[in-house]
Swiss-Prot record:
Listed NCBIfam families: gid_trmFO, PRK05335.1
Plastid found in the keyword field: no
Name this protein carries in UniProt: Methylenetetrahydrofolate--tRNA-(uracil-5-)-methyltransferase TrmFO
This protein's UniProt keywords: Cytoplasm, FAD, Flavoprotein, Methyltransferase, NAD, NADP, Transferase, tRNA processing
Main location: cytoplasm
Reactions mediated catalytically: uridine(54) in tRNA + (6R)-5,10-methylene-5,6,7,8-tetrahydrofolate + NADH + H(+) = 5-methyluridine(54) in tRNA + (6S)-5,6,7,8-tetrahydrofolate + NAD(+); uridine(54) in tRNA + (6R)-5,10-methylene-5,6,7,8-tetrahydrofolate + NADPH + H(+) = 5-methyluridine(54) in tRNA + (6S)-5,6,7,8-tetrahydrofolate + NADP(+)
Assigned EC number: 2.1.1.74
Residues binding FAD, per UniProt: 9-14
Length: 435
């Protein structure tokens, strides 16, 4: 008799895990604490809420995340189905309307006959049965304590949320439309240019601004991919200009040259009524954010629909605790999925949920478990999370540095394309194993 699977957490990983298990004929109970209880960063009542940004990053196979998305498309991922159905213009990236995305995933999950959505907080891990723990980086207190006892120890760090401004409060005489190097439709981003004097004054204010301080018992460890702007600014006056404010590839059509620095605004929803400040995650106090970000040309009268904030991310030491199948080494009926495993990013979380969901279903049906090939993006990420050195483990985005080397000498400009080609060819050969 096939066992029922319990999935804890209705985020990207949990929904993907539940969907993949149900697709394979296994009954799933998916627990989600919203709307009865919200974390400090969540606001929508639906499943698969996107918190940090509405961007799913680059779509080109030149980027490993682009390959990961293509693999998930071919694997019939619910995450990618929802993303394609709710996407908004974003140059060479894939971005979604976060409200529509959550609504889409919620509808698909709730309408599946083998998935029961239970709206209540889980405070104890079931002692029997197959469990997928996908409680996310903002795991609630009692469940976090449970995981701590189960795992022996857990790590934590902060990442940050970027502000959103109302489109009708932007001064379009000062901002110009362009995508870096003309990618996408060429005008998917709004760009607020700064000259050298404006940039230097802006950086000085950020460095001197009042910040939200962490509690005394919390050690701050920032993930490089979601670094607060004030942390970057403190590293040197030019750091922001080589980070989120880099002007390279953005020519102001009014003067015909690249500005000294640029703040990019990305469309947040389909109606184009909201724009987020790209890469401007921050832990500045809210009054300081309003004051300093209104120094940006074009945002002098900005209406902030959401201000930046900080939240804690909880993740386990996956190389120490997990098998490549996403199973807990010490109790193999328990699977972990999503950011709590140390993958970083929306697409990566869904990828982790895919592997956990497939394997949980196979375990429930008495079949052998699978490990995606290391030559694929989904496999390279899974291998890194479970095989890297445990003593120096940190959250990781998918990138081509995680992939096995290509044989022989390969020209640098050809390497990424060949890695992507090999990855997709390997995936196609692996698909029959999932049947």
């Amino acid at each position: 008799m096939t066992q029922e699977i319990t999935v804890i957490g209705g985020g990207l990983a949990g929904c993907e895990a539940a969907w993949q298990a149900a697709k394979r004929g296994v009954k799933v109970r998916l627990f989600e604490m919203k709307p009865n209880c919200y974390s400090e960063a969540h606001h929508l009542p639906g499943l698969s809420e996107l918190v940090c940004s509405n961007s799913l990053r680059g779509d080109s196979l030149e980027n490993a995340v682009g390959l990961l998305k293509e693999e998930l498309r071919r694997l019939q991922s619910l995450f990618m189905e929802g993303a394609e159905a709710t996407k908004v213009p974003a140059g060479g990236a894939l971005a979604v309307d976060r409200d529509l995305f959550s609504q889409y995933i919620t509808s698909r999950i709730e309408s599946h006959p083998l998935i029961e959505v239970v709206r209540e907080e889980v405070t104890r891990i079931p002692e029997e049965g197959i469990v997928v723990l996908a409680s996310g980086p903002l795991t609630s207190g009692l469940l976090a304590e449970e995981i701590g006892r189960l795992a022996g120890s857990y790590l934590y760090f902060y990442d940050a949320i970027a502000p959103i401004v109302a489109a009708d409060s932007i001064d379009y005489d000062k901002a110009f439309r362009a995508s870096r190097y003309g990618k996408g439709d060429g005008d998917d981003y709004l760009n607020c240019p700064m000259d050298e004097e404006q940039y230097q004054a802006f950086v000085r204010e950020i460095v001197a601004a009042e910040k939200v301080e962490p509690k005394s018992f919390e050690k701050v460890v920032h993930f490089e991919g979601c670094m607060p702007i004030e942390e970057m600014a403190s590293r040197g006056p030019e750091t922001l200009r080589f980070g989120p404010m880099k002007p390279v590839g953005l020519v102001d059509p009014r003067v015909g040259v690249e500005p000294h620095a640029v703040i990019q605004l990305r469309q947040e929803n389909r109606e184009a009524t909201m724009y987020n400040l790209v890469g401007f995650q921050t832990k500045l106090t809210w009054p300081e954010q309003k004051r300093i970000f209104r120094m940006i040309p074009g945002l002098e009268n900005a209406q902030f629909l959401r201000l930046g904030s900080m939240h804690r991310n909880t993740f386990i030491n996956a190389p120490e605790l997990l098998m490549a199948t996403c199973q807990l080494k010490s109790d193999q009926r328990i699977f972990f999925a999503g950011q709590i495993t140390g993958v970083e990013g929306y697409v990566e979380s869904a990828s982790s949920g895919f592997v956990a969901g497939v394997n949980a279903a196979r375990l429930a049906q008495g079949e052998g478990l699978v490990v995606p090939p290391a030559e694929t993006a989904i496999g390279a990420l899974a291998r890194h999370i479970t095989n890297t050195e445990a003593g120096h483990f940190q959250p990781m985005n998918v990138n081509y540095g995680l992939f096995p080397s290509l044989p022989g000498r390969v020209k640098k400009k050809e390497k990424r394309g060949l890695l992507a080609q090999r990855g997709l060819e390997t995936l196609e050969k692996w698909l029959p194993e999932l049947s």
